[in-house]
């Protein structure tokens, strides 16, 4: 009895879902317009209903509803056709919440009196929904969103055998997961690209697992369509009045409505004709818009600059006839949310009240059709993504809204034979009032189109240092072709000379800078206006990268001379020896990045004795080896502190000596709380730097170095620990050379290898360098 009640409640629930949809033609079986009912057939003829109630708030789904699971989760017995609640089972079939995808036989129906179950073959969409639901119950993620590869794919891989059995794990199975997320958006999955500013974040629209629907309860598509026709959807879509809609209405009602529209149109035409005969004049004293009069009795042509607004208070009643545009008062379209509104159009049907605007019309009414980006209707089948702020000024707006087309380009709906003659009469009468406006719009677009069709002059950019290295490598790889071409030999020698000058710290000849300097001497205005291009002064960075090849290390690269051991000429030997003469090292500083007060020291270590200190201690004690009363002085501590401006020259010198030329870490002064510098007295022996917030949930360790004479004392271990603690809750990433033994140290902290990058350091090392140029990309997941 209880099972039959439960069965009827499930059927009624499907009936309610079906009645919220609208009828449609040509849909596949199991698909209802407005709400896709995804029914996936499995091998055992069982099906799964992945539809959810669309009436809830799809923006809020943080944690799974455990109480809902306790009430709804049950298993369907194939023999007795009953639903058995999970609480009545003798053993737990699945350790995952919301998982009842089993071919189940209850203990009453089985021959041995034991419950029998067998895993059904799951589809990828079911697996993804189960994974995301269980992740939400764990409370992980960010605002209910989960990362596609790091969270969802990792969960599926962890439970692969339990969910997918012996299904073969292909090399691109994670791409299948990404495809399921994209295809199921926005019906089942919602992207977090808007909230976090980066792709790869997803969550369930309704945080409930997919429900299993056995074959006995499956409703036919025809039944769903019949029930859906009796109740329209309650999600209205605002459309523009005047657009024709498909509707199955009584022919008598259609004829009456057509007659009423025709009378309204005739009334509007009479009013316009009367206004043309009694055309007023334009008050020039209060209007700032230039007006050009063509002839008496004709509407003045209002000439507008882009972004200018007409002042309607300065226009007479004769000038208040609206342009050919939809009525400002929209009408509600109660069509199905899954059906795009019909884009066929009819002439503007205006009444006398519509001729006098109550408020200022939209600015888009006074621009050409090519400049208008939206038609006022958002396709409900798409998920609206607002364009980035920077794209507004740089180019056309890109979104899901469709471009407005001219009246002559809009596809007309097929009309009946009775409507055609009347329709042609209306069109012919409205054509006279629209022809002049369309002609002026075409004339205005012609010079703009001619201007746009002109080929743009090429804009040349200087070759970067890395591109010069690649070009020189290519020339050296084909000596035969270079020997036969004088131009190639000349280019090769020029590149070699430029490289030699960089190694020796000599200035390079730059024609653009010479011409720019000459123009600045003649007149500063010419230099500022020349081409609208701001040239970089000598010494600025020339390491350009595309978005695909962007590297965080590029921000520290400069065009300084690359000779090994080269140092700033302003750096004194005393500063390089003892760091600085700054006596105010014991004062706190304020971080410009987080506005936190940073103490003078992170840690003062009196216990660690690196090999360098042990050697110094032995040298001092050797002098007093014959003095039994000699007591050694206490050693100075190792001071861990935040980076300061006086540290930068020495750190840059060490980076250029032990890493590669052209490194300048001055940018790290903008976020000193994500740095650590180790001092012995005033000598810098180690340092580490991290770039915070390279992504929404990720930080990047850019440089970590300990002087070779101070290693194997735990200094690097504490620096890594400190940098990790500064970004609690965020992933920490880094690149490490493939031949660097420090990889073992990173693995102790939980860093995992994600990628092996070939020739990662080839961009930075000199050509003659023998260092390993490949790198591992490591990530510490939090």
UniProtKB/Swiss-Prot annotation:
Q: State its location(s).
A: Nucleus; Cytoplasm
**Biased composition annotated in UniProt, kind: Basic and acidic residues:** 256-276, 405-426, 446-459
Q: What positions are modified (Phosphoserine)?
A: 4, 285, 416
Q: What is the protein's major site of localization?
A: nucleus
Instruction: Identify the SUPFAM superfamilies for this entry.
Output: Acyl-CoA N-acyltransferases (Nat)
Pfam families assigned to the protein according to its UniProt record, in alphabetical order: Acetyltransf_1
InterPro entries named among the record's database cross-references = Acyl_CoA_acyltransferase, GNAT_dom
- Please identify the protein, giving its name as recorded: Cysteine-rich protein 2-binding protein
Q: In which tissues is it expressed?
A: Expressed in skeletal muscle, heart, lung, placenta, brain, liver, pancreas and kidney. High expression in skeletal muscle and heart. Lower expression in lung.
Species assigned in the record: Homo sapiens
Gene that this polypeptide is encoded by: KAT14
Give the multimer and partner information: Interacts with the LIM 1 domain of CSRP2. Component of the ADA2A-containing complex (ATAC), composed of CSRP2BP, KAT2A, TADA2L, TADA3L, ZZ3, MBIP, WDR5, YEATS2, CCDC101 and DR1. In the complex, it probably interacts directly with KAT2A, MBIP and WDR5.
Q: Which domain of life is it from?
A: Eukaryota
| Function text | Component of the ATAC complex, a complex with histone acetyltransferase activity on histones H3 and H4. May function as a scaffold for the ATAC complex to promote ATAC complex stability. Has also weak histone acetyltransferase activity toward histone H4. Required for the normal progression through G1 and G2/M phases of the cell cycle.
For the modification N6-acetyllysine, which residues carry it?
A: 231, 292
Please note every region of biased composition (Low complexity).
315-335
PROSITE patterns for this protein: GNAT
List the CDD domains hit by this protein, alphabetically: NAT_SF
The UniProt GO MF terms for this protein read:
histone acetyltransferase activity; LIM domain binding
- Any idea where the N-acetyltransferase domain is? 638-782
**UniProt keyword annotations, A-Z:** Acetylation, Cytoplasm, Nucleus, Phosphoprotein
A GO BP entry: regulation of cell division
Chain spans, region Disordered? 13-33, 251-282, 315-346, 400-460
Record's Gene Ontology CC terms? ATAC complex; cytoplasm; mitotic spindle; nucleoplasm; nucleus
